[in-house]
């Protein structure tokens, strides 16, 4: 499973740790949904590999807010992400933020959940953005959606997923 954020925030850029801003709910939601046996801190991101999980971004440029990115940056990021997925061949790509998914892959009507698109043999799922700015989703409702992904991924053969 490769999780893909939108782009590094300023705190992530400063620390080198994904989803590092204290208000970001990625790490709590990852645990609440059963992907990790305990809540990891951003500085523990390397432990994801031991659970069969990886993490990357659509766009490498750090910004204070994702809306500072251009449409071209998203499109270029989508192409680079596709190449990365083709090289690494995870079973699943989980794009954390449906708006980023829509922009990166040119699918303006995409919704949260499994996507028809596949990248090689990799299945794709768009997840809600765990940023504290996303008030439409609570940690609990996000954990439900992340849990749906986990259940679908476990149905493949469960390799690398805890539980």
Predicted features, each with a name:
Residues 12-72:
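Short, surface-exposed acidic-centric catalytic microdomains
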Residues 21-22, 29, 65-81, 107-163:
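C-terminal capping/extension of enzyme domains
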Residues 3-6:
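N-terminal nucleotide-binding beta1-loop-alpha1 segment
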Residues 8-11, 61-63, 130-133:
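A short, flexible beta-alpha/helix-coil linker loop
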């Amino acid at each position: 499973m490769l999780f893909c954020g939108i782009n590094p925030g300023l705190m992530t850029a400063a620390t080198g740790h994904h989803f590092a801003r204290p208000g970001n709910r990625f790490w709590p939601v990852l645990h609440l949904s059963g992907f990790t046996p305990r809540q990891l801190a951003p500085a523990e991101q390397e432990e994801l590999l031991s659970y069969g999980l990886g993490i990357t971004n659509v766009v490498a440029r750090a910004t204070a807010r994702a809306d500072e990115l251009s449409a071209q940056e998203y499109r270029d990021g989508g192409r680079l992400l596709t190449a990365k997925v083709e090289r690494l061949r995870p079973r699943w790509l989980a794009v954390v933020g449906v708006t980023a998914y829509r922009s990166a892959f040119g699918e303006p009507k995409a919704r949260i959940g499994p996507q028809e698109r596949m990248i090689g043999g990799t299945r794709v799922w768009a997840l809600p953005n765990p940023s504290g700015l996303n008030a439409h989703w609570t940690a609990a409702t996000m954990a439900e959606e992340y849990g749906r992904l986990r259940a679908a991924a476990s149905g493949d053969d469960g390799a690398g997923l805890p539980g």
